[in-house]
A protein has these predicted regions:
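Extreme N-terminal starter segment of soluble prokaryotic enzymes
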Residues: 1-5
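Short polar catalytic/cofactor-binding loops
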Residues: 7-12
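Short beta->alpha transition motifs characteristic of CBS
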Residues: 46, 52, 95, 106-112, ...
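CN hydrolase (nitrilase-like) catalytic-core segments centered on the catalytic cysteine
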Residues: 62-78, 146-226
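Active-site catalytic loop in hydrolytic enzyme cores
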Residues: 85-155, 169-176, 238-245, 255
């Protein structure tokens, strides 16, 4: 599977400018013959904004329409997170649009309280996966990365996909945790971050792809660019069979509410 990672600056709270910028990037840097999946950062139309009441869109809005159009025109799936409004609630939602018009959504589970995200958005309640070119992919968003139980491999995915607005001040955490998720889950890990600065923070990029050994396949460092990587399903399967750590994993389940 061939993936394009889009690492770029974002214009603060300006969806039109950001969609225009991504339109130009996709036209110049992404080929439909060499790409199965395009990954955009977290909140790619606004930056990591708490202005949900002002900028959140319905699923019938301009951003999802743009994603569907680009996916169908380019012949590749495209995914990233956007602030969304649904039934009176706001969500930091990962959206995946497939060329055949299928749409997959995942609402961020762990909201970043240090930026009061939990005061402006509702948390998601379920982990989601989707299939693409025989790969099973589990999308997660930024702060989710710090919670390994939520990403624990249970035989249901081959790729962990993180989209983020992860600040420069904690870049070592980003790189270390992504690599740990790859090793402990024996999977590919794709992390797509932004560069530049917004109203509050600066971002160093560090979009990266680790294989199931924790070895680096692609590192975009702090460049504004589109990076390309190819993932090998056979190599992953062979490794999991030859070194089956998963057979000794502890069993667990999610418990929503414990009795008093």
């Amino acid at each position: 599977m061939k993936i394009a990672l889009v690492q770029t600056e974002l214009v603060w709270e300006d969806p039109g400018a950001n969609l225009g910028h991504f339109t130009e990037l996709l036209a110049s840097e992404v080929s439909s013959t060499d790409t199965d999946l395009v990954v955009l950062p977290e909140m790619f139309t606004t930056g990591f904004s708490m202005s949900s009441a002002q900028f959140a869109e319905p699923m019938s809005g301009d951003t999802v329409s743009w994603m569907k159009s680009k996916s169908q025109q380019g012949g590749y799936a495209i995914g990233g997170s956007v602030m969304m409004q649904e039934r009176g609630n706001f969500y930091n939602r990962f959206i995946l649009c497939h060329p055949d018009a299928e749409i997959i959504t995942y609402d961020k589970k762990h909201l970043f309280r240090m930026s009061t995200e939990h005061d402006h958005y509702s948390a998601g309640a379920r982990r989601v996966g989707f299939s693409l070119n025989d790969f099973q992919i589990c999308p997660q968003i930024c702060y989710d990365l710090r919670f390994p139980v939520w990403s624990r491999h249970r035989g249901d995915y081959d790729v962990l996909l993180y989209v983020a607005n992860w600040p420069s001040a904690r870049r070592s955490h980003w790189l270390s945790l992504l690599r740990a998720r790859a090793i402990e889950n024996q999977c590919y890990v794709v992390g797509v971050n932004r560069v530049g600065a917004d109203k509050n923070l600066s971002y160093s990029g560090d979009s990266i792809v680790y294989d199931f050994h924790g070895e680096t396949l692609l590192d975009l460092k702090n460049e504004t660019c589109v990076g390309h990587v190819t993932l090998d399903q056979l190599a992953l399967n062979d490794y999991r069979q030859s070194f089956p750590v998963w057979k000794d994993a502890d069993n667990f389940d999610f418990i929503e509410d414990l009795p008093d």
